[in-house]
Amino acid sequence: MSLHGKRKEIYKYEAPWTVYAMNWSVRPDKRFRLALGSFVEEYNNKVQLVGLDEESSEFICRNTFDHPYPTTKLMWIPDTKGVYPDLLATSGDYLRVWRVGETETRLECLLNNNKNSDFCAPLTSFDWNEVDPYLLGTSSIDTTCTIWGLETGQVLGRVNLVSGHVKTQLIAHDKEVYDIAFSRAGGGRDMFASVGADGSVRMFDLRHLEHSTIIYEDPQHHPLLRLCWNKQDPNYLATMAMDGMEVVILDVRVPCTPVARLNNHRACVNGIAWAPHSSCHICTAADDHQALIWDIQQMPRAIEDPILAYTAEGEINNVQWASTQPDWIAICYNNCLEILRV
């Protein structure tokens, strides 16, 4: 019997540790598969791959593997047709690309831009380009963003199939960079934005890296932690400040002036996810245990209230909207993952 036959609205999985990073698989043959990263304040951390058994309506842990330090982000290859190898990337001390098999997950490549030093500048985040899945971009506390190119080689025994090289590295901000995201504008391959501790949102073009555009600066110069592009209208993006209770919506055509502020949360916001299928819906999640869905189509008129609210049993660390199944949102809090039908 299918999920839709049962019409269950919420599925829950309890991990053996606090869940921080989390993301949906996008492969069409792995509908309810997610990756979860542990948050343990020591070297030894874990990543789990879990899947929903649609017969039993229970999440099953398919695979667990070790990861040095907590993952700051994890992402599956944006492969909606299932034509590329089944790859998962994680950021932490370095960017790692893993190959997921039926029984084991193995490290394909470790991308390290600092070959001459024992010191590594931790990566705060990364993004995987949807148009060109051979491109990834990382953000780091060393003020830089690095764009990586992956190569997939031929099978030669047990030689890793995937390797990578630095396409470009740029000093993106005056202080630490906390997030990076590719834009779908201009073909979707060359434009990306970053946010950081200097409180600015900056836009870059891989074809013209000699200059960047400041789209927004926080009035109090509070660090900006996250940015998220609208999936359907590349003019819009959302960002939030460290310890901030509101999410700011920006229009790149009107720099430095927010077109909306979403401020119903009662504690600091931790996550933002735009709807994959609609330009006017966005989900925000916060320490107030709430996940809120907003309809922003009346911008620039003020948006007073969300259209949907869900209260979890703990502070929500992360929210992800399933790109291939737009009626499902995943949240994590404490040691729990929940997927919610919206």
UniProtKB/Swiss-Prot annotation:
The signal peptide annotation in the UniProt record is: none
Annotated compartments: Cytoplasm; Nucleus
- Gene Ontology CC: one annotated term: cytosol
Q: Where on the tree of life does the source sit, at the highest rank?
A: Eukaryota
Q: Where are the WD repeats?
A: 6-52, 60-100, 108-150, 165-206, 213-252, 257-296, 303-342
**UniProt main location, coarse:** cytoplasm
Chain segments annotated as transmembrane: none
GO molecular function, a single term = protein-macromolecule adaptor activity
Keywords for this protein: Cytoplasm, Developmental protein, Nucleus, Repeat, Ubl conjugation pathway, WD repeat
Nucleus listed as a keyword: yes
User: What InterPro entries does this protein's entry cite?
Assistant: DCAF7-like, WD40/YVTN_repeat-like_dom_sf, WD40_repeat_CS, WD40_repeat_dom_sf, WD40_rpt
Q: Which SUPFAM superfamilies match?
A: WD40 repeat-like
Task: Mention one GO biological process in which this protein takes part, according to its record.
Answer: protein ubiquitination
Note the PROSITE patterns from the entry.
WD_REPEATS_1, WD_REPEATS_2, WD_REPEATS_REGION
Which pathway? Protein modification; protein ubiquitination
The similarity comment for this entry is: Belongs to the WD repeat DCAF7 family.
Self-association state and partner proteins as the record states: Interacts with DYRK1A, DYRK1B and DIAPH1. Interacts with DDB1. Interacts with ZNF703. Interacts with human adenovirus 5 E1A protein.
| Protein's job | Involved in craniofacial development. Acts upstream of the EDN1 pathway and is required for formation of the upper jaw equivalent, the palatoquadrate. The activity required for EDN1 pathway function differs between the first and second arches. Associates with DIAPH1 and controls GLI1 transcriptional activity. Could be involved in normal and disease skin development. May function as a substrate receptor for CUL4-DDB1 E3 ubiquitin-protein ligase complex.
What name goes with this protein?
A: DDB1- and CUL4-associated factor 7
Q: Which organism is it from?
A: Homo sapiens (Human)
Gene behind this chain?
Answer: DCAF7
